[in-house]
Structures are given as C-alpha cells and as structure tokens.
Amino acid sequence: MYKRQVFILLVSLITIYIIKIQNIDRPSKRILYLYSLYWFISLFLSTLGLYDYKVPKFETLFCLCISCWALIGGFLLIKCPVKSVDLKQSGIQLSIRGFFKNKLFVGVLVVLTCYSLYLLYKFYTFMALGDLYQIRNLYFESGDLNIYGALFPNMNYWILKPFSFLCAGLFGFGVLYYRSKLLLLIFVMLFSLSSLGGGRLDYFRYLVIPLLLFGYCFYPKRFKVTLKKGFLILVMAAAMFFLLTIIGAGRRGYMEFDKESLDVGVEMTTENLMSYSYGPIVAFDYALNNNYLDKLGGYSYGTLTFNAFNGLLDIAFRMIGISYGTNFSDFVILKQDTWITLSRQNFDKNWNALFSWNFYFYLDFGIVGMIVLPFLFGFLIRKSIYWFYRYQNVSSMMLLSILFLSLILSVLDFNLSSIPIGILMIYLYMKSHNCKLK
C-alpha cells in the first residue's frame, strides 16, 4: 500500500513542478493547478482505505496518472498569448451588458425563476411530509411517479439544466466583475434548482465552481489571502458546510433542527466530502476488475463520450425512419441503476453513478481512450481560453465556464454527455466567433 502512496506523491510533485516552470498565462496555470491538485489529492486519499473503502490496484492508479498527464499535454500544446484580461475593463463588459438587455433572455430567466420557486415550494412541502431520501428517489423517477410531475424530467433535461449551465458562468462573472439586478434572479433560480433533488453536488456545480474560475483563476493579480478575503472565504465555507449538514441529516430522516440532527448531519457531511473525493476512483477500479466492458458488449467507440452529438444523429435518423441505434441507455442502466459495494468488510458502502470521466473514455476505447480523449479535452479547454482572450464576449465566457466546470468535476463524472449541453456548446462556439471584436 505504501508503494501506491509514494508513487502518487512522486507523480504529483513532478506534475506541479512541470506546471510551475511553464511560461504560460496566469489563468491557464491556475486552472492546471486546480485540476492537478484535485486529482492527485483524490488519488492519494483513495490509497488510504478511509471509511472502510477498498483500495484501487496500482495499475488503475498508474493509468489514471497517465490520463492526467495526457490532459496537461493537450492543454500545453496550444499557444496562448502570455497575458491575462482585465475583466473589469475588457470588451466582455460591453458584451454582457448587451446580453442582460436581451428581452428573450430576461423573459426566459423570469419565467424559469418563478417556475423554480414553485418547484422549491413543492420540495419543502414534500419534505415536511417525508424524509429527504424518499424525495431524492422520486426526483429521478419518470412520468407520473416523479415528485414534480410528469413533465418535469423532460423540462429538466432539455431546458432547466442547459439554462443553468449557461447562467452559472454569468453568475460567477457577474458577482465579481459586473453589477446587475438580474444576478439576484440568477442566484435564486440556481439555488432553487440545486435544492430540488435533495443532493449536494449541484450547489458546487452552479454556484461555487464558477466563482472559483473568475474569483481565483482569472483574478488579475497575484492571489493573496488578506484578512478580508480570508474572512469572506471562511464565512462562505461555513455557510456551505452548514447547508450540506442540514441536507445530510434530512437524507437520514432527521428533519428536526436539533442537536441530534446536526450531529448526524456533520458526521454524514464529513464522510461524504471524503468519499466523494475518492469514491469514484474506487468505483472505476471496481468497474475495471468486474468486466463492465463485457457487460456493455465491448468497446463503444466514442458513442458514450460524444453522446451529445451521437444522440443528435440518432434523433435525426429516427425522423426519417432509420433506426440509427445507440447504447447510451444501456450504459446509464449499468452506471446509475446498478448498485455496487465498495466496502472491504462491512458491505455497507453502496455506490452508483459516479465513476469519474475516465469511465466513459475507457468504455469507448480502452486504455487508449484514457490517453487520447483527455488529451483532446485539454486541447479544447486551452483553446477556449484563447477564444476568451481573443473575442472577449459573453458567449466565449460561457463556453469556457462550461468546460472548466466539466474539468473540475472530472474526478466525479463526465458532465458533457447530454444532448442539450452539446447543442448549447455548439451555439456558444458559433455565437462567440460571430460576435468577435473588430
């Protein structure tokens, strides 16, 4: 076991040194630091066997390290101007001002904010009648069984989530560099939608990670933690931990606001913060060693990683009466509806859904996929930074924030596989290039 820990420490130190000596722009370097630190901390924690979790095999850890290096290699392949952008003075200020005056966007935002508040009201109504665990199960049901109604699953997939991805970047940028009353509506909508499933990840996905991108990575100066900044970060962290504690207690059936509920919530939140850091790595190791590739019928050759576009082809062919076919539904059943145990002894660590984004890459092309696809993604995210520098408009900013979000959450899952997100990214790419500064 010590061999694994020494290996991860050695690789992480080499990686940080390689990043440090690169002559690249400050935001790019900070993004690489965040990605590398999160991955290698998670890999190291997975070797400790905390909370009775199994320890991944050395071969699995080695492949994951190579995958991390592949992304860094693709990222560094693109040459960006060694500069940054003053987000308070750049052309994006004019672009975002025009976007916030767009009547269609404002109208959709108002309607979806009202709808999200209605759903939040239903959430608290149901929470008063039952425990949060039951509510979460009903949140994922389809049709009339869904807690928010038969139309909600499609509304959530096609409209609410893509719009939330779009607004997350606006929120992170606007809170720090732009003042608008619409930011309050965006916050209310994102907070409400993040609460509906009784989960915790969406709070980080839509509210915390965008602030990390624009508050740290694109901070125009050397980042120093002053007393004021430290106090603000501490207050935000405490508020987030308290929120997660309340949710954790509710999922155990403790709905009262008392000491016992808080104790249970703190215990569950602490364990979950740890397990969600390395659990997906242990789950990925489990999948490698339990023939998940054979269960899916062999390699998928890109249909999982690029399901956002493969699904569009499937829809297009079906419209003309041709059965194109896709195995993504079988993959979802294998990934989300099949529960596994990651415990070494007690068999109480039930797990599903989160296997890291390498799960997609491996099932598509095997070990080669774990090298080539992260390399391409690293290439893409650095390219998106270049587009952001060059065009300085709201569309390039949103595209960058979506890719950054997927990068940071790569330890957990792959966030770019849904069809609506694929459509949104294509639209933002085209819009950013059409609106470039003259």
Language model segments and positions:
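Small-residue-enriched transmembrane helix-hairpin modules in multi-pass membrane proteins
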Residues: Y139-L151, L244-F377
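Hydrophobic, membrane-inserted alpha-helices
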Residues: S12-T15, F165-F171, L185-L193, F355-F359, ...
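Membrane-interfacial loop-to-transmembrane alpha-helix junctions, especially the N-terminal start
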Residues: I24-Y38, R179-L185, W387-L400
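N-terminal "leader" segments that precede or initiate the main folded domain
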Residues: K3-N102, L190, Y206-G250, L416-H433
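Membrane-embedded catalytic interface detector for glycan/lipid assembly enzymes
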Residues: V82-M255, W339-L342
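Hydrophobic alpha-helical segments
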Residues: N350-K438
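Hydrophobic alpha-helical transmembrane segments
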Residues: V6-L13, G107-L120, N156-A168, F359-R382
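Membrane-interface helix caps and helix-loop-helix hairpins in membrane proteins
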Residues: Y51-V55, S195-Y203, I408-L416
